[in-house]
C-alpha cells in the first residue's frame, strides 16, 4: 500500500458532513416510503446511523477515491465517473445499512426490501452522492480539490 497523501482534517470533515446529511435524508425517505418502516423505526435507524456514518465517512471517501482513480484509468469519461460512484456506494453502503436495520429491530423482510431498494436506487443515489461529496469537499476547501478537477488528486492512502 503506497501513501498518496497525508490524512487531511478538512477532507475527513467534508466526507463526514456529506455522509451524515445525505444518508439521513435519503435513508429516511427509502425506509418510510419504500420499505414500509414506521416513522419511529426509521428515526431510530437514522439516529443510530449518525455515529456509524461518522465512523465510516472517511474510509468510504478513501474507497470511493480509489474506485474513481481505477475507473479513470479505464476511461476518463464522465459516465465512468458516475459508474465508479455508483459501484462505490452500493458495495460500501449495503452491508453497513443491513447491520443498522438489524440493530434497530427491522424484520428480515424489511431489511431485504430496504437494502435491495437502496441498492437499486443507489444507481442514482451513488451518482448524486458523489456530486454532493464533491461539492462538500470544495465547500470545505479540501487541498488538491478544485471545481475544475473531475477526478480529485488522491488525498488518502491507496487501497
From Swiss-Prot:
InterPro entries: Ala_export_AlaE. Exports L-alanine. GO terms for cellular component: plasma membrane. Belongs to the AlaE exporter family. It is a multi-pass membrane protein. Keywords: Amino-acid transport, Cell inner membrane, Cell membrane, Membrane, Transmembrane, Transmembrane helix, Transport. GO terms for molecular function: L-amino acid efflux transmembrane transporter activity. GO terms for biological process: amino acid export across plasma membrane. It comes from the Bacteria. It is found in: Cell inner membrane. It comes from Photobacterium profundum (strain SS9). The chain crosses the membrane at residues 17-37, 48-68, 86-106, 110-130. Its main location: membrane. It holds the Pfam family AlaE. This is L-alanine exporter AlaE.
Amino acid at each position: 500500500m503506497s501513501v498518496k497523501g497525508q490524512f487531511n482534517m478538512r477532507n475527513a470533515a467534508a466526507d463526514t458532513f456529506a455522509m451524515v446529511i445525505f444518508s439521513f435524508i435519503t435513508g429516511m425517505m427509502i425506509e418510510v416510503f419504500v420499505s414500509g418502516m414506521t416513522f419511529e423505526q426509521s428515526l431510530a435507524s437514522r439516529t443510530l446511523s449518525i455515529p456509524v456514518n461518522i465512523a465510516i465517512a472517511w474510509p468510504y471517501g478513501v474507497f470511493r477515491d480509489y474506485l474513481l482513480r481505477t475507473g479513470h484509468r479505464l476511461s476518463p469519461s464522465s459516465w465512468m465517473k458516475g459508474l465508479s460512484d455508483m459501484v462505490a456506494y452500493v458495495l460500501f453502503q449495503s452491508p453497513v445499512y443491513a447491520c443498522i436495520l438489524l440493530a434497530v429491530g427491522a424484520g428480515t423482510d424489511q431489511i431485504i426490501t430496504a437494502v435491495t431498494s437502496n441498492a437499486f436506487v443507489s444507481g442514482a443515489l451513488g451518482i448524486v452522492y458523489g456530486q454532493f461529496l464533491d461539492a462538500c469537499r470544495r465547500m470545505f476547501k479540501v487541498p488538491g480539490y478544485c471545481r475544475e478537477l473531475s477526478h480529485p488528486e488522491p488525498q488518502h492512502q491507496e487501497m
